[in-house]
Regions:
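Catalytic domains of carbohydrate-active enzymes that cleave complex glycans
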Residues: 2-175
Length: 175
């Protein structure tokens, strides 16, 4: 998208996004577009109701990762969208392509899954939570997500490891 706009700044951004979504997410594209629209609407709501603008960086991301910005019903709606995306992926006939697209969608699902675990673990019984944590940890490792945030004060110290966080969540369950 950025490369296209560097070559021609007059291109229609929404058209480029649509084209990217169709090629990258294939049959799941409408659902990932719905997800992107929902995320953008949430950021807009945060800006309008709280005057809060999203910025990159560890300090900003830690301040944003709160239930007031990501209500449970919002995250649940996102997970429903991902369920529809996974169902659509099954329509892809070519197995290799289906697996590639599934992995792309799984990668996109990691952030809302993390937020559900971190902000709303008390909504689930121990068995559900254990399964969610173990699936999240396994998927994160398989998809190459090792850390859930940066630490700009000491980038060589990886205290924000997914494995450490998952172990912390599991310890909170007991057993």
């Amino acid at each position: 998208l950025h490369a296209e706009l560097l070559w021609d700044a007059d291109l229609d951004v929404n058209e480029l996004i649509d084209e990217f979504m169709e090629h990258y997410f294939k049959e799941a594209a409408p659902y990932l577009q719905e997800y992107l629209d929902l995320v953008n609407a949430n950021y807009k709501l945060m800006e309008q109701t709280r005057g809060y603008l999203a910025y990159a960086g560890s300090d900003e991301s830690s301040r944003m990762a709160r239930a007031e910005f990501y209500p449970k019903r919002y995250l649940s709606r996102i997970m429903e969208i991902f369920d529809k995306a996974y169902a659509a992926i099954e329509q892809i006939e070519d197995e290799d392509e289906r697996n590639i697209v599934r992995e792309r969608v799984e990668t996109e699902s990691l952030s809302p899954r993390f937020m559900l675990l971190d902000l709303y673990s008390y909504y689930y019984n121990d068995s559900q939570l254990r399964t969610m944590i173990e699936e999240f940890r396994d998927d994160s490792a398989r998809l190459g997500l090792l850390h859930y945030r940066e630490d700009v004060s000491n980038p060589s110290e990886y205290k924000y490891s997914i494995n450490i966080k998952a172990d912390e969540w599991l310890r909170s369950l007991g057993n």
